[in-house]
Amino acid sequence: MSFWRKRIGTLRAGMVVAGILLLASLASYGQQTIRMSLADGFDFPVGKPNGAGYYIARGLRLTSPIHFGEDWNGRNGGDTDLGDPVYTVADGVVTWAYNVRAGWGNVVIIRHAYRDPATNQVKFIDSLYGHLLEMKVKPGQAVKRGALIGTIGSNSGMYPAHLHFEMRHNLKIGMHRESVARDLTNWASPSDFIKKHRQLNREWNQVAAPAGTYPVYQGFKGI
């Protein structure tokens, strides 16, 4: 009798675990929401707040050869910026913070809500910080503009040290950049966007931002 009780207990535990895994799987596809504050402005991700001491070695290019963001380097060249601080460009919530290896290394993605001055509508945008030496944040963490989120890296020596920085209007990209059209409806020119949104009105109310929008990532995902 005790044998069957143990078997039933084991089966129940297995069903609970399976249920949790199923819910987690569904959540990765679902269109949940997260509460977040509206950004009161955007700053540059290095040399805060104005990018002092850094330059853009390579910018956004949506035609061949494709480059989906900006590469920020320290003005002293080489690996002199290795380990330099990287900051979030605006208030937001971390949606991704993993080591995905390959050509990326450590990657942080943060979702931001802001009121568009041109339309007065609340909009959302993702910022991505790639090749980091260290990550200082975790998924689900709320961050304030200028908060330390990581340090400049080289993807374990694959590249000279630099920050790969992207901003995306399309919230469904995640780590699947080839899944959407190469145009400015999906991608933002990072520096242009920041310059146009340096100072926004402070609003104390929070908004519901889309969450769970990224396709499931099948590659390596470490912390």
Model-based region annotation:
Residues 1-9:
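N-terminal secretory signal peptides that target proteins for export/translocation
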Residues 96, 131-134, 151-154:
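A residue-level detector for short acidic-glycine micro-motifs
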Residues 120-127, 168-198:
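Short peripheral tails and domain-boundary helices/loops at the edges of structured domains
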Residues 80-82, 87, 116-146:
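Short histidine-centered loop motifs in beta-beta connectors
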Residues 152-164:
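Active-site loop architecture of trypsin-fold serine endopeptidases
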Residues 14-25:
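Bacterial N-terminal signal peptides
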Residues 26-106, 115, 145, 154, ...:
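Surface-exposed, glycine-biased beta-strand/turn segments
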